[in-house]
Design a protein with these regions (language model features):
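ATP/NTP phosphate-donor binding region
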Residues: 1-14, 24, 60-63
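Short, active-site-adjacent cap segments at secondary-structure transitions
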Residues: 22-23, 47
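Catalytic core of DAGKc-family lipid kinases
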Residues: 31-36, 40-120
């Protein structure tokens, strides 16, 4: 909602500072607009930023953003909700849900969630 409001007020660039969840929320608000999304990664995985080769160090990310390169990207939808990097179903979706509920972050926590479910 904040990203949509920013565009309605005339913003042509909206910056997301956070992880994949934050980036997804901000990017969702920019669909069908001419506004650009700037990403400064600060999450535990930063999958989309890594895919786009945006450095995970904030100062390095800002240097990349200052180059002003804008590129279009595709997105998908599931049940009306957009996604920009990954989408999972079945066991993968279950693990993602448990990971989100755990409050822990990082690749070890993700593996731990999967192993706990597998061993039950």
């Amino acid at each position: 909602e904040l990203a949509k409001e920013a565009v309605e007020r005339g913003a042509d660039i909206v910056c997301s500072i956070g992880g994949d969840g934050t980036v997804n929320e901000v990017a969702s608000g920019l669909i069908h607009t001419n506004a650009a999304l700037a990403i400064i990664p600060s999450g535990s995985g930063n999958g989309l930023a890594r895919h786009l080769r945006i450095p995970t160090d904030p100062l390095s990310a800002i240097k990349v953003l200052n180059r002003g390169l804008v590129q279009s990207m595709d997105y998908g939808t599931v049940n009306g909700r957009p996604f920009f990097c990954t989408c999972g179903v079945g066991f993968d979706a279950f693990i993602s849900q448990k990971f989100a509920e755990s409050g822990k972050r990082g690749p070890v926590s993700n593996m731990e969630s999967g192993l706990n479910k597998s061993l039950r």
